[in-house]
Structure formats: structure tokens, C-alpha cells
């Protein structure tokens, strides 16, 4: 397992298309943050999805939950913008050096997704997309980040020199695929929690509550599509049950599919997951297109 992670971390994977560095010249020390558009043929008349790969907030599964997803969306007539956001790094997963140094942690990740939403909307005309049909899809920890963008859109974390955003930071829809949700209790995914909050932050009940998605569903939460699998060995399947209940209690339009099999980390693969769980791809496309009929 560790060898596989090391390979994924060290491999140089370059997405196709023009890569943009949204923090360029802004002194955020975030040169590794990149966004790459994958535009459909009729790009101005279809939704756009910002894709957030998973990786426990320590690394990014850039291939299986990033590039392949963006290409799949584009090939199905949906624009994609692949976001490579800041993570704690694989080193922090092994050596716990953030006991001594800040490293990467919250709010770095939500800064990156908000900066991406802002950049894409402000540059929608030159990018060739519709800024009013812009959503976010995330996998595992990326699903937590996608939901965070919906839950905290009224707080501008970007702190740009020109001031608060004049465009909405709220995504128009969210796809949460086998997401991390809660930071509390027996169902919390501890590695993601540590990646997000830091070595000291995990001991703070205030910080755990602050980043537990189920505690922060806003009145204006956009529609949510969510799936996971009962046999998930990585992120306990109750995370999505918790989110489903929170969305239901808040009256948020959403679709939740719980598959019996499929495990975790299958993305849009034709190989990984199960025949049952791979149905999520068609279900998502039907759901998304239904939002704009």
C-alpha cells in the first residue's frame, strides 16, 4: 500500500489542456495549485464541473479521480475543470512534522476551491463557459472539500488584495462521491481529519465541529448528488448516511444512492468498483442534465 502511494506521489502526471495557476503573483506560496480546463464541444451551453480528487488531504489521486474524471465528463458533453489543490503532503502522513511546523492545513484547501470558483466565474467569457452553471465534484476527501465549498460559500477565505469576491462563491451543484463528511466520532476518517486540521488541530473539538459538514448545511445549499458503498473499507459508509440525514433535515434537494458493493476509490473506472457501483456515472449524468432541463 505504502509503495503504491509513494509511486502515485512521485509520478509526474501532466493533464492535457492549458494549465492555469490561479494564485500566480499573489504571494500565497501556492505555486503547486493548478487548474486545467477540459471543455466540451458546446462549452458555453453546458454545465461545468470543478473536479477535486481525493487523497485523505495528504496527496491527490490525480489520475483516477482527476484526469480520468475530467476526460469522462468532457467526453459526455460536460465541461470539467481539474483542480490540484494544496494538501498536507505524503511526508506529513508519515513523519507528523506538523507538530512543529504549520505545513499545509485548513483553510488552505478551501482557499483553493474558492479561488478556483472565483477565477472560473470571473473569466467565464474567455474560458468559454456559462458562469451560472458551475458546480463541484469531489471524491473521498475531495468530496469533503466539494461540500465545504457549498457550506462555507458566504465566508470568503481567499483574502485577495482586491477585496472580497464580486461573483458568487457558491457552487450551483455538488457531486460528493464516497465522501468524507464528519470529523467527529467513530465514523470520522482519521487520516483525512489529520490532513485537514493538522496534528494539533485534531485534538480541538471546536475545529472538529467547524469542519464536520453535517453541522453546517446552509439554507442556500445547492442540489447535491451523493453515492457510496456499504463495503467501503476506507471511509465508513455512515459518513454519507450522516450527510443524507443533514441534507434531508435542512430540506436540501439531493439524490443519495447507497450501493451494496464497490468499495472505495474507483472513480469513473471500468475496472475498479463493481458492476453495481459503476452505475453511478449514468445516474450522475441523468441527475445533472435534469437540473437544467
Over which residues does each language-model region extend?
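N-terminal cap/lid segment of alpha/beta-hydrolase-fold proteins
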Residues: 9-43, 107
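Mobile cap/lid helix-loop segments that gate and shape the active-site cleft of serine hydrolases
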Residues: 25, 163, 179-216, 222
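Short beta-strand element of the alpha/beta-hydrolase
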Residues: 46-54
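Catalytic nucleophile-loop/oxyanion-hole region of alpha/beta-hydrolase
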Residues: 61-68, 84-131, 272-277
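C-terminal catalytic histidine-bearing segment of alpha/beta-hydrolase fold enzymes
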Residues: 93-96, 227, 237, 241-293
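Primarily recognizes the serine-hydrolase "nucleophile elbow" in alpha/beta-hydrolase
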Residues: 115-189, 208
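Acidic catalytic loop of the alpha/beta-hydrolase fold
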Residues: 183, 231-235
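Short beta-strand/loop motif that positions the catalytic acidic residue
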Residues: 220, 226-228, 232
